């Protein structure tokens, strides 16, 4: 039988890592599941000028995310890489089914973040990376 976590966080961007950090800090068994690299949109940011509660002059997105990931780990949050295919959020124990296995939790936090969406313009491909 799979371990039942107190909290599973879907997504390891700034919001997901913060949720995982505070859940772990509260001594809740915590698992962070991310399909790609940690950081989401902030991982591709060269310089962060404004972040709540921090003075981060000249810090890059990847360095901030590395610190956040390390803090979450320090407070006991586990992390796995997987793509979640389906979820069952009814009942006391929630079930998430991914490519690599099944995950169980009392609480699920969805922090899947933002991603660019095409606007439907035929010629957008030429200009989208400028």
Each language-model region and where it sits:
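Short low-complexity stretches enriched in small and charged residues
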Residues: 6, 35-37, 63-65, 109
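FAD-binding core/adjacent interface of flavoenzyme oxidoreductases
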Residues: 1-10, 26, 77-130
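Glycine-rich NAD(P) Rossmann-fold beta1-alpha1 loop
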Residues: 13
């Amino acid at each position: 039988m799979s371990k039942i976590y107190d909290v599973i966080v879907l997504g390891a961007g700034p919001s997901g890592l913060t949720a995982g950090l505070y859940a772990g800090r509260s001594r809740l068994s915590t698992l962070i599941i991310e399909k790609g690299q940690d950081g989401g949109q902030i991982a591709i940011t060269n310089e962060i000028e404004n972040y709540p509660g921090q003075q981060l002059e000249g810090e890059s997105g990847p360095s901030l995310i590395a610190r956040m990931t390390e803090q979450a780990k320090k407070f006991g949050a586990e992390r796995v890489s997987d793509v979640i295919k389906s979820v069952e959020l009814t009942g006391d124990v929630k079930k998430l089914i991914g490519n690599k296995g099944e995950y169980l939790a009392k609480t699920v936090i969805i922090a899947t973040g933002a991603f660019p969406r095409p606007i439907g313009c035929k010629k957008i491909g030429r200009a989208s990376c400028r």
